Structures are given as structure tokens and as C-alpha cells.
A protein has these predicted regions:
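Acidic donor-binding segment of Leloir-type glycosyltransferases
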Residues: 1-21
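Hydrophobic helical membrane-anchoring modules
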Residues: 11, 60, 66, 131-197
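Cofactor-binding loops of NAD(P)H-dependent oxidoreductases
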Residues: 21-24, 47-49, 160
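Residue-level signature of catalytic and energy-coupling elements of molecular machines
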Residues: 35, 50, 121, 150, ...
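Acidic donor-binding/catalytic loop of UDP-sugar-dependent glycosyltransferases
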Residues: 1-5, 47-64
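Acceptor/aglycone-binding surface of glycosyltransferases and processive sugar-polymer synthases
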Residues: 16-17, 21-38, 43, 55-136, ...
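Active-site phosphate/pyrophosphate- and oxyanion-stabilizing loops and adjacent acidic/basic residues
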Residues: 4-7, 33, 59, 148
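Conserved residues at the C-terminal ends of beta-strands
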Residues: 47, 76, 163
Length: 197
């Protein structure tokens, strides 16, 4: 029902410049890449539509980029406390574990590699896209496309803590075990690319 809801929002707010796009493929990663290629600004932002991260937090991400403190800004949900039921117990510990693993593999500190909230310059996004083939094309969410790409380009990576809330809209499309297995495959692939002799 998301498509109808988005169209309704566009009709209800005619004074706001809302672009409505339909992705050609499937998955969040495909949707983000499609939207970024249509976007007009010099700064590109990802904010998940389930409102687990307040839209008001995006100003903090913008300020990090605009001030030159960082060139790739990644959200982290695991610094502040979070609302009850915002993240399942198993997901919480899996997120922490994957953050430690990818921090080691990438030689870059991450506390939350799977937070959907990310901000970057368009020019850096275009470079990340051009280098995407180095790490393959099997990330359905796009998080690792951006993280791997940013680290490979030696961008200044900064994490911004967000207050993670229980979702107020929609239902999760993430399968813990199927997508968890996919993440394990990414770990092995990244190890071979980055650490194996």
C-alpha cells in the first residue's frame, strides 16, 4: 500500500516539492540507487520511511557534511538507549557483532553498519557507484555498497548517533535468518577481498 500512500501525500501537499518514483527492480538498495540517480541536490540522504529515526535528526547529518567534519555520515542506533521493542534482542546483538567484524575488515570503526540513515555528497556517490563492481552486486539493502565504497575511496567517515524508535509505519521486510545468512556471505567475501593474502 506504500505506492498509494506516497501518491496521496503528494496530492495532499501540493506546495511541497515531492517527487514520486517507482523503482525498476526490487529491494531497498535498488530503490535508493534509483532515487539517488533522480535526485537534484549536491547532498544525498537516506531516511527510512518507517520513521524509526526521527526526520529532525537529519540536520545533524547535514551539519557534519556541510562543516567538513565528515564526507560520509553513517547513523548509529546503538549508542543511545532505544524505545522498547524498537529492535529485537537477536537483531541487536547481531548488529553489534557485524559492526565489530566489519570494523576489523575495513580498518574503520563502525558501531552500526546496518543503520539505514546515511548522508553523502553526490560527487562521492558517483565515485562509489563507479567502483561498485569491486565488491560485487549482492547487497539488497545498499548499506554495504555505501560503506565499502566510502572506505575504499578513503572518505572521512563519521558516525552520528540517532534515537531509534519502534516503527510507526509499515512492517519490516527483513528476514532475520535469510538476510543474516546473506550478511555472513558478505563477511566472507569482504575478508577475501580485503584481508586474505
Amino acid at each position: 500500500n506504500s505506492w498509494e500512500e506516497i501518491q496521496r501525500m503528494q496530492r495532499d501537499y501540493p506546495d511541497v516539492d515531492i517527487a514520486v518514483l517507482k523503482q525498476p527492480g526490487k529491494g531497498k538498495g535498488d530503490a535508493v540507487h534509483h532515487a539517488f540517480q533522480q535526485a537534484k541536490g549536491d547532498i544525498l540522504m537516506i531516511l527510512d520511511g518507517d520513521l524509526t529515526v526521527p526526520p529532525e535528526d537529519m540536520i545533524k547529518f547535514y551539519n557534519v557534511l556541510a562543516s567538513g567534519v565528515g564526507e560520509f555520515v553513517n547513523g548509529t542506533r546503538l549508542v543511545y538507549g532505544m524505545e522498547k521493542n524498537a529492535m529485537r534482542f537477536l537483531n541487536y546483538h547481531a548488529n553489534r557483532t557485524f559492526a565489530l567484524i566489519f570494523s576489523y575488515l575495513l580498518n574503520q570503526q563502525f558501531t552500526d553498519t546496518l543503520c539505514g540513515t546515511k548522508v553523502m555528497f553526490r560527487s562521492d556517490y558517483e565515485k562509489i557507484l563507479a567502483n561498485k563492481s569491486f565488491f560485487g552486486d549482492f547487497d539488497p539493502f545498499g548499506d554495504f555498497d555505501f560503506i565499502f565504497g566510502a572506505v575504499k575511496l578513503h572518505l572521512k567517515v563519521v558516525e552520528v548517533p540517532v534515537r531509534y524508535r519502534a516503527r510507526t509505519y509499515g512492517s519490516t521486510q527483513i528476514s532475520r535468518f535469510r538476510h543474516g545468512f546473506m550478511l555472513l556471505k558478505m563477511v566472507i567475501f569482504a575478508f577475501k577481498k580485503l584481508k586474505a593474502i
